[in-house]
């Protein structure tokens, strides 16, 4: 039997999941996306060449791997085919390697218009959404008025359903947000044209994954645990469940089939958009982390906020997702610092707590409690052998393991796939 491994971002997203999934996929037969949409931005660097994927699983770069988009993903067909076109131009036979669940909810241009109109209307209270229609699409899915990929199998019915849904969207856009309506007829024709190309890619992902019982399968999470709609810093969250449990319901694979849950976390913390961030450094340290770590969002181009590693937030993610091990990324970004801090607890209303509280208001009231470490002041960039790490860097990693109570099994020391220390083989 193959191993079924779930890869979850343990912070506020942007932890480096794409590189790690790409690396692990060398020993896998399939990779599955199970939540989110094209608001994800997974950056891969292979042999010095950079590829950014937003919707298609990171396993698409491997010729021996099937890539699946599960039912928990919300699908923008325009974004999908832009990505397919770009990858095909690079010589990657995407249509041979990719299959998509018919149960995926469809993102329409009117979802995107609503998303952007709502964010504009919020003004200074904006959430920080990517403006790509993710939230409004999930909203329609839950309200059972949304369209699914399988609806394209019946063009006449699809036309009627889309007409009704977009009429509702346009009413909101014009009468509540005072924005321009989206052209319904043009959108219907565009989406029906996409339908002809997407039909061959449709497959029941639940059944398809049963064919991979003897192979390793990677379940690729998007965003991060602290952006979970239920367990994250609500309302400054994404619109899907990002914890490990969503790998099951978002792909149709039973939870007993999942063997190992890997947390991805940077050696420090970043966040894009609005919301509380107790260990944020709005100073020279934050500037240094942003510059050296090249902290710019792959999906939006927005600069990320930066701060020290936040263990109470990681503990919240650990409780939600039952991580078996940790992959620590961007260790090399800390190389030049004289001292390095870890937020080990919060002070909340004069009480010391070691797990991040639920919701944004309580988290905003927390003050970080730090433990300070002497920096190693030696380059770790590109190191592949743990023995070559400076002792102070190893002490830093050991302290993270001690606080979390689980092992750091992978250490990333650079963007390239080869810049990795594998302390434990996760896939045989």
Curated annotation (Swiss-Prot):
GTP binds at residues 13-19, 41-43, 304, 330-332, 412-414. One of its GO terms (molecular function) is adenylosuccinate synthase activity. GO terms for cellular component: cytoplasm. It catalyses: IMP + L-aspartate + GTP = N(6)-(1,2-dicarboxyethyl)-AMP + GDP + phosphate + 2 H(+). InterPro entries: Adenylosuccin_syn_GTP-bd, Adenylosuccin_syn_Lys_AS, Adenylosuccinate_synth_dom1, Adenylosuccinate_synth_dom2, Adenylosuccinate_synth_dom3, Adenylosuccinate_synthetase, P-loop_NTPase. Pathway: Purine metabolism; AMP biosynthesis via de novo pathway; AMP from IMP: step 1/2. It holds the Pfam family Adenylsucc_synt. It is found in: Cytoplasm. GO terms for biological process: 'de novo' AMP biosynthetic process; IMP metabolic process. It comes from the Bacteria. Mg(2+) binds at residues 14, 41. Binds 1 Mg(2+) ion per subunit. IMP binds at residues 14-17, 39-42, 130, 144, 223, 238, 302. Substrate binds at residues 298-304. Its EC number is 6.3.4.4. The active site is at 14 (proton acceptor), 42 (proton donor). CDD domains: AdSS (cd03108). Its cofactor is Mg(2+). Homodimer. HAMAP family: Adenylosucc_synth. Belongs to the adenylosuccinate synthetase family. Plays an important role in the de novo pathway of purine nucleotide biosynthesis. Catalyzes the first committed step in the biosynthesis of AMP from IMP. This is Adenylosuccinate synthetase. It comes from Dichelobacter nodosus (strain VCS1703A). The gene is purA.
């Amino acid at each position: 039997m193959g191993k079924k491994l779930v890869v979850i971002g343990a912070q506020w997203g942007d932890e480096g999941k794409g590189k790690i999934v790409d690396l692990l996929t060398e020993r896998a037969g399939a990779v599955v996306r199970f939540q989110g949409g094209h608001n994800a931005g997974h950056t891969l660097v292979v042999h010095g060449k950079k590829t950014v994927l937003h919707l298609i699983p990171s396993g698409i770069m491997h010729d021996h791997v099937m890539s699946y988009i599960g039912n928990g993903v919300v699908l923008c067909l325009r974004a999908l085919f832009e990505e397919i076109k770009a990858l095909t131009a690079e010589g990657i036979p995407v249509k041979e390697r990719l299959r998509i669940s018919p149960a995926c909810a469809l993102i329409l241009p009117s979802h995107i218009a609503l998303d952007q109109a709502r964010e504009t209307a919020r003004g200074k209270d904006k959430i920080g959404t990517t403006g790509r229609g993710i939230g409004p699409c999930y909203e329609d899915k839950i309200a059972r008025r949304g369209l699914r990929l399988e609806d394209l199998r019946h063009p006449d019915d699809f036309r009627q359903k889309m007409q009704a849904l977009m009429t509702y969207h346009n009413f909101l856009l014009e009468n509540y947000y005072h924005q321009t309506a989206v052209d319904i007829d043009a959108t219907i024709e565009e989406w029906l044209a996409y339908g002809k190309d997407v039909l061959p890619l449709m497959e029941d992902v639940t059944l398809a994954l049963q064919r991979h019982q003897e192979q390793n399968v990677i379940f690729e999470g998007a965003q991060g645990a602290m952006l979970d709609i239920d367990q994250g810093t609500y309302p400054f969250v994404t619109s899907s469940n990002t914890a490990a449990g969503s790998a099951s319901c978002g792909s149709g694979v039973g939870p007993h089939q999942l063997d190992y849950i890997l947390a991805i976390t940077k050696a420090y913390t970043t966040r894009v958009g609005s919301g509380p961030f107790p260990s944020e450094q709005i100073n020279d340290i934050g500037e240094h982390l942003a510059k050296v770590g090249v902290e710019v969002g792959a999906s939006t181009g927005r600069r990320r906020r930066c701060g020290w590693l936040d263990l109470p937030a990681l503990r919240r993610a650990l409780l939600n997702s039952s991580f078996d091990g940790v992959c620590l990324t961007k260790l090399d970004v800390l190389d030049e610092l004289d001292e390095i801090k870890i937020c080990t607890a919060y002070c909340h209303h004069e009480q010391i707590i070691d797990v991040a509280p639920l919701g944004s208001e309580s988290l905003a009231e927390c003050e970080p409690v730090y433990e300070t470490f002497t920096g190693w002041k030696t380059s770790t960039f590109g190191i592949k052998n743990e023995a070559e790490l400076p002792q102070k860097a190893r002490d830093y990693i050991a302290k993270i393991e001690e606080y979390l109570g689980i092992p750091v099994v992978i250490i990333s020391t650079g963007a390239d796939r080869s810049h990795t220390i594998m302390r434990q083989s996760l896939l045989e």
